[in-house]
């Protein structure tokens, strides 16, 4: 078997996942594109050499948005069949919903399958260029620090399951070279060239423009920024969680604002967001958030937000 510099890079990445020290069952989420084929090749080569994973399975979610989706599935199954590992195909009824909502449905289906089939790890094919594109998309949508670093190297989603992205430090150019090197059968998805999709326009117009006229290493510069931001965001997140645990009521859905009001504004906002998300699985909007921060807490007050009645009295914020 021929080893390349991407094999070596992959081998250097895997040991960094601390929980990959024993035989594990992994579920590889496929998209059908070049990233998926590259990921399959790297993982199968790695396991053939080290026999590290006790079970490897593949999963593909078909949105049925494309007229050639069935042919794409046959093409993918034909390639995966050489691995002798199980592949699961889920089809979602064609719906007129946004790409973001469809991505969320796909994510839920993959996680549910992983739980039902006792997998330890979900592996995705996101690469470094995907991370840059996601950063630019989120930046234009006005996201905060948390949203800018939304594609972490590794993420724990349940007590038993983690998502890992072993290609996250490998760019699209390297992935394409790898596929050509090993003659991997890339399926050309015509929807990748529809400029009505913002991500495609970023990929084929904005990023080349930034490289040509602003900085040829714009991708690596953005990655460096994201790396630093991720460290700082993690520090703020950990301190926010500590503050939330110290300020929440032990019996009721309530939080003592007196404890957090002297903290930095960034911590105040984070703690309030944690309070609403932890109890109601909702992120409070900026208008309500600013109202709560600026309010005088010596008087009794009620704020109605969606189905919630937010009560404020004597430094306590509580929900009725």
UniProtKB/Swiss-Prot annotation:
It comes from the Eukaryota. InterPro entries: Rossmann-like_a/b/a_fold (IPR014729), TilS/TtcA_N (IPR011063), tRNA_Ile_lys_synt (IPR012094), tRNA_Ile_lys_synt_N (IPR012795). One of its GO terms (cellular component) is chloroplast. The keyword Transcription does not apply. It is found in: Plastid, Chloroplast. Keywords: ATP-binding, Chloroplast, Ligase, Nucleotide-binding, Plastid, tRNA processing. Its EC number is 6.3.4.19. Pfam families: ATP_bind_3. It catalyses: cytidine(34) in tRNA(Ile2) + L-lysine + ATP = lysidine(34) in tRNA(Ile2) + AMP + diphosphate + H(+). ATP binds at residues 31-36. The keyword Lipid metabolism does not apply. GO terms for molecular function: ATP binding; tRNA(Ile)-lysidine synthase activity. It is an enzyme of class 6 (ligase). One of its GO terms (biological process) is tRNA modification. Belongs to the tRNA(Ile)-lysidine synthase family. The N-terminal region contains the highly conserved SGGXDS motif, predicted to be a P-loop motif involved in ATP binding. PANTHER family: TRNA(ILE)-LYSIDINE SYNTHASE-RELATED (PTHR43033:SF1). Ligates lysine onto the cytidine present at position 34 of the AUA codon-specific tRNA(Ile) that contains the anticodon CAU, in an ATP-dependent manner. Cytidine is converted to lysidine, thus changing the amino acid specificity of the tRNA from methionine to isoleucine. This is tRNA(Ile)-lysidine synthase, chloroplastic. It comes from Gracilaria tenuistipitata var. liui (Red alga). The gene is tilS.
